[in-house]
């Protein structure tokens, strides 16, 4: 799909991971980490209990990814030969050159640099588009792994959405931290 910033969404290739287009052949890989309870620690909904729930989620992101203002990639581990997460751009505003970054990574790969490599690929790709200017993301304030990763990359904390998240499992509200990165923040 071609956008008005002169590019189309493409697969991105790193050292240990590739960001590949959505492909239902990897639904079992997605299901494998979607049934791990700790994966949902920083998500508002409960652990998937069946392959059908995973397929429903996959179909939902496929449907969104067909829109001009959204795209998801699957995070594919070259060494493990499997999908270990997803990363995407939402609410892409091609006129302003902005987008929201979203992501989810298998807990089996937390703290090992896979998210940082995925983040780098998406940021580099996005900021190489003409007219691109800013990326932003929301994360649980208590998600220190995510907060540290995006801060170390250069994202700046812009603010807090108080009690933004509502956990369906516990009915507990938590703050969301808002981070942003401008093209001008990237050191050449």
Feature locations, PLM:
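Acyl-donor (CoA/ACP) binding surface of acyl/acetyltransferases
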Residues: 1-28, 33-36, 76-188
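Conserved GNAT-fold acetyl-CoA-binding loop/helix
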Residues: 38-60, 71
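A generic membrane alpha-helix/interface feature
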Residues: 53-56, 62, 149, 172
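Short loop/turn motifs at secondary-structure junctions and domain boundaries
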Residues: 63-68
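Generic hydrophobic, aliphatic-rich segments that mediate packing or membrane embedding
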Residues: 69-71, 85
């Amino acid at each position: 799909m071609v956008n008005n910033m002169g590019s189309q969404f493409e697969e991105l290739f790193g050292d240990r991971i590739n960001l590949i287009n959505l492909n239902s052949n990897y639904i079992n890989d997605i299901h494998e980490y979607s049934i791990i309870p700790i994966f949902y620690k920083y998500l508002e909904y409960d652990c998937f209990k069946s392959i059908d729930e995973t397929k429903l989620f996959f179909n939902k992101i496929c449907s969104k990814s067909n829109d001009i203002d959204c795209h998801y990639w699957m995070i594919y581990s070259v060494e493990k030969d499997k999908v270990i997460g997803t990363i995407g751009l939402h609410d892409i505003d091609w006129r302003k050159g902005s987008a929201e970054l979203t992501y989810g990574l298998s807990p089996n790969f937390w703290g090992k640099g896979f998210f940082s490599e995925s983040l780098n690929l998406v940021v580099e790709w996005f900021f190489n588009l003409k007219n691109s200017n800013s990326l932003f993301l929301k994360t649980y304030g208590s998600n220190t792994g995510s907060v540290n990763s995006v801060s170390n990359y250069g994202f700046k904390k812009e603010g807090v959405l108080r009690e933004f998240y509502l956990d369906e499992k516990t009915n507990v509200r938590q703050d969301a931290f808002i981070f942003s990165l401008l093209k001008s923040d990237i050191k050449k």
